[in-house]
Regions:
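Hydrophobic h-region of N-terminal signal peptides that target proteins for export
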Residues: 8-17
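Low-complexity, Ser/Thr/Pro/Gly-enriched N-terminal "stalk/linker" regions
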Residues: 16-84, 102-136, 170, 229
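Extended, well-ordered alpha-helical scaffold segments
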Residues: 23-27, 31, 53, 101-117, ...
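Well-ordered alpha-helical scaffold segments within catalytic/enzyme domains
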Residues: 28, 88-102, 154-170, 207-221, ...
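C-terminal beta-rich recognition modules with glycine/proline-rich loops and embedded aromatic residues
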Residues: 29, 228, 294, 354-363, ...
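Solvent-exposed loop and edge beta-strand segments that line ligand/cofactor-binding
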Residues: 66-85, 136-156, 188-206, 241-276, ...
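Catalytic-core region of carbohydrate-active enzymes that cleave or remodel glycosidic bonds
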Residues: 283-304, 324-373
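Solvent-exposed beta-strand/loop surfaces of large extracellular or lumenal domains
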Residues: 475-494, 511-519
C-alpha cells in the first residue's frame, strides 16, 4: 500500500457490495484514511496494537486477574479483553478488501492462521476465558453475573468468517465453524440457554445472531440456522421475561418502560446488535412480522431515545434520552444505530432510514473520531470542555470498545453510498464526494456536501441505464438540473455514454427546541464524568435549550471559531421563544464549515460564530470548549 508522507493516505479505500466499489473522497475520505492508517494497517496497528489484542488469549486476564487498586468491582466478574482481537481483525479484513491491498490481505491471513494454531483447542474452543463454563447467567440468588465470555467469542468468530472470505482462506472458515459448533455443543450439554448467559438479560450473547447467519451462508450447516431460530424464539417467550424484543415491539410502551430499572437491562449497543441480526433473520426466513417488529422498535427509539446529537440513548442505555437536557452517546451506539437503519433501508427500500443514518454519521459519529486517527471518544457530548475521551479499558493500553469499532462506521457509510434496489436499479443514496464503480456504470460525486449546497453527480454508462437518486428529507427542496425533485426518490434515464446531474440542496437553518421539560433530571454524574475531567464539573445543563440544525448538519459554538467562552457555554436559552436563524459563511481554520449565525425573535438579536458539530471538538485535548445549545 503506497503512502505519501503528507499526513494524508494516498491510496483510496473502497467499499464493496453487490458488485459495487465505492471510494470516499473529500473531508470524509481523508478522515477515514487517517483512521484506517493508524488503526488497521500502519506499523503501530500491525505492531503493538495487534500484539496486545493477541496477548489477551495468553493471559486469560478476563477471568483470572487479581483486582488491583481501584479495580475491586471486577473481582469475581468476567471482563471483555476477548472482544478486541475480533473487532480489530473484523475491521482490518474489511479495510483490506476495500483498499484492494494484496499484501495486507497476506499479512492478515498469516496472522490469523498463527492465532488459530496457537489458541484454538481441538474441540474448537477459542476464547480469553480460562474457564469455558463461566458464561454468566443468574447466580444462586437469581442475580445476573457480570460476564462477557460469549460476547468475546462472537467477535472472534465473526472476524474469522470475514477473514476467510476476504483472504480466501477456507481453513479460517473451518476455525470459525469449529468455534460455533463448540459453543452450541457446550450450551446443550450443560443445559444452559443462551438467553440466560452474559449480562444485560442475555443480549450480548444473543447478538451472535448476525455473524451466525453469515456463518450459515458460508457453510450451509443446518445447525446454525436451527440455533438462530432458538435465539429469535427467545425474544417472544411466555411470561414476558426481559428483553422479549419481538413481543414488546408490538406493545404500546416505549423501550425504557418495558421493565423496571432500564439502566440495568436496556443496553443500547447490544440491543441494536440484536436488532440488526433480527432484520437479517426476517429476510432470510421470509418473516415480515419480525421485520415489522424491528421497524416498530426503531420507531419507539426515535420517539423516546433520539438524543440531541443524532444518535440514540443516554451513554449506552435506553432510559428516555430524549427527555434529558444533556446528551451523551457512545460511538458504539452511533455505529449500531447506523447499522440498524442501513439494514432496514436495504430490507424495505424506505428512504427515511437513510435520513437517520446520514444525520448520525455526519454528526455524532464523525465527532467521536479524533482527527489524528489514533484514538477517539468514549462518549460524544452535547457540550463541554471536550468529548469524553475513551479510557483505556480492562488493563489494555491500545484498545477500547468504541475505538476498535470506528473503522466499520466509515466502511458502512461507504457501502451505503451506492447500492442496488431489489429491482436491480442502481441507487445513489449519499452525496459526499466519492467515486463508485458498478459493473459497467461509473458514478462520481463532487462538491462539499453537506457543508455546501451543491453537488454534481456524473454517471458514465456503456448503455442506456436507469439510475435512482435519493432525495434527502433534511432539505426544504432539492433541485436536479434546475427542476424540483419530488422525494423520496428521483429517477432518471442515463443515455449511453453518460450524463452529469447538477444537484442543489435548498435549506434554511432551523432552531429546534429540546424535547426535555423544565425540571427534567440532568443526569449530571453520567454526563460530566468529572472524575476523568474535572473541568466538566457543574457544566451540565439544568434546563432545556434549543439547537441549530442545517439540513443534515448539527451546528455548534466552539473555541475553534470564537474565543468568547461565555458565549459558548452560557446558560441562557432561546428554547420556546420562536427564534429564527440566518447563516453567513465565514472563514475559519481547523473546521470543516463555519458560519456567522444570527438568531432573532424580532426583538432580541443574538450573533454567534458556529461550525459543524463534527469539527467542534474532535481531538483529545481538554479545554476545547463547545456547545450545541442556544
Amino acid at each position: 500500500m503506497k503512502v505519501i508522507v503528507l499526513g494524508v493516505l494516498a491510496v483510496a479505500l473502497g467499499a464493496w457490495g453487490d458488485g459495487i466499489k465505492v471510494t470516499l473522497e473529500g473531508a470524509v475520505g481523508r478522515k477515514m484514511d487517517t483512521l484506517c492508517l493508524k488503526r488497521a494497517y500502519g506499523s503501530e496497528a500491525k505492531g503493538r496494537i495487534y500484539d496486545e489484542a493477541v496477548n489477551a488469549f495468553r493471559t486469560h486476564y478476563d477471568d483470572t486477574r487479581k483486582a488491583g487498586v481501584g479495580e475491586a468491582w471486577t473481582q469475581g466478574k468476567g471482563l471483555w479483553q476477548g472482544e478486541y482481537w475480533g473487532k480489530t481483525m473484523l475491521s482490518s479484513a474489511l479495510v483490506s478488501e476495500y483498499a484492494g491491498d494484496a499484501a495486507f490481505k497476506d499479512w492478515l491471513r498469516t496472522k490469523a492462521r498463527a492465532f488459530v494454531k496457537e489458541f484454538q483447542q481441538p474441540d474448537g474452543y477459542l476464547c480469553t476465558y480460562k474457564d469455558r463454563t463461566f458464561v454468566g447467567g443468574p447466580d444462586k440468588d437469581g442475580r445476573e453475573v457480570f460476564c462477557w465470555n460469549l460476547w468475546g467469542r462472537k467477535y472472534t468468530m465473526w472476524a474469522l468468517v470475514e477473514l476467510a472470505r476476504v483472504t480466501e482462506a477456507p481453513d479460517l472458515l473451518e476455525a470459525a465453524s469449529k468455534m460455533m459448533d463448540q459453543e452450541i455443543d457446550q450450551l446443550e450439554k450443560t443445559g444452559v440457554r443462551i438467553e440466560n448467559t452474559g449480562y444485560f438479560v442475555g443480549m450480548p450473547s444473543m447478538s451472535v445472531l448476525k455473524p451466525l447467519l453469515e456463518l450459515y451462508r458460508a457453510t450451509k450447516k443446518p445447525a446454525y440456522l436451527d440455533f438462530a431460530r432458538k435465539i429469535v424464539a427467545a425474544w417472544e417467550r411466555e411470561g414476558n421475561p426481559p428483553p422479549n424484543l419481538v413481543a414488546n415491539a408490538f406493545g404500546p410502551k416505549p423501550v425504557h418502560e418495558w421493565y423496571p430499572q432500564p439502566a440495568w437491562w436496556a443496553k443500547a449497543y447490544e440491543m441494536m446488535s440484536c436488532l440488526e441480526g433480527l432484520v437479517d433473520f426476517a429476510e432470510m426466513e421470509g418473516k415480515p412480522r419480525l421485520l415489522d417488529a424491528v421497524k416498530r422498535i426503531v420507531a419507539k427509539l426515535e420517539a423516546n431515545e433520539l438524543n440531541a446529537v443524532g444518535s440514540v440513548g443516554f451513554f449506552d442505555h435506553f432510559t428516555n434520552a430524549s427527555a434529558c437536557p444533556n446528551a451523551t452517546t457512545e460511538p458504539c451506539d452511533v455505529i449500531h444505530w447506523m447499522r440498524v437503519n442501513r439494514a432496514l433501508f436495504l430490507a424495505t427500500g424506505e428512504a427515511h432510514y437513510l435520513d437517520s443514518f446520514e444525520f448520525a454519521f455526519y454528526n455524532a459519529f464523525l465527532a467521536g473520531v479524533y482527527r489524528d486517527g489514533r484514538w477517539g471518544a468514549h462518549s460524544v457530548r452535547s457540550h463541554g470542555t471536550s468529548h469524553r475521551t475513551a479510557p483505556h479499558q480492562v488493563g489494555m493500553k491500545y484498545h477500547q470498545c468504541c475505538i476498535d469499532n470506528m473503522p466499520r462506521g466509515f466502511l458502512d457509510f461507504a457501502a451505503t453510498a451506492v447500492t442496488r434496489g431489489k429491482d436491480g436499479v442502481l441507487t445513489v443514496n449519499l452525496y459526499s464526494a466519492m467515486k463508485a464503480k458498478a459493473d459497467k456504470v461509473g458514478v462520481t460525486v463532487t462538491g462539499d456536501y453537506p457543508i455546501g449546497d451543491e453537488a454534481k453527480v456524473q454517471v458514465e454508462a456503456d448503455a442506456e441505464t436507469k439510475v435512482r437518486f435519493r432525495v434527502p428529507g433534511w432539505f426544504d427542496a432539492v433541485e436536479v438540473d434546475g427542476a424540483a425533485a419530488k422525494g423520496p426518490w428521483h429517477e432518471a434515464t442515463v443515455p449511453k455514454g453518460g450524463k452529469t446531474f447538477a444537484f442543489r440542496f435548498v435549506r434554511t437553518p432551523k432552531v429546534v427546541d429540546s424535547k426535555a421539560k423544565p425540571g427534567a433530571d440532568p443526569r449530571r454524574r453520567a454526563f460530566e464524568e468529572a472524575r476523568e475531567d474535572p473541568g466538566m464539573t457543574n457544566l451540565s445543563r439544568l434546563t432545556p435549550a434549543a439547537k441549530l440544525v442545517y439540513g443534515p448538519l448539527l451546528l455548534a459554538k466552539a473555541k475553534r471559531v470564537t474565543k468568547d467562552a461565555k458565549a459558548i457555554l452560557g446558560r441562557d436559552s432561546v428554547q420556546g421563544r420562536n427564534f429564527t436563524c440566518t447563516l453567513e459563511p465565514i472563514e475559519a481554520d481547523g473546521v470543516w464549515g463555519a458560519w456567522e449565525a444570527t438568531l432573532t425573535d424580532g426583538v432580541t438579536t443574538i450573533v454567534r460564530e458556529v461550525c459543524d458539530f463534527s469539527s467542534a471538538a474532535d481531538s483529545e485535548e481538554s479545554g476545547n470548549l463547545f456547545s450545541i445549545w442556544f
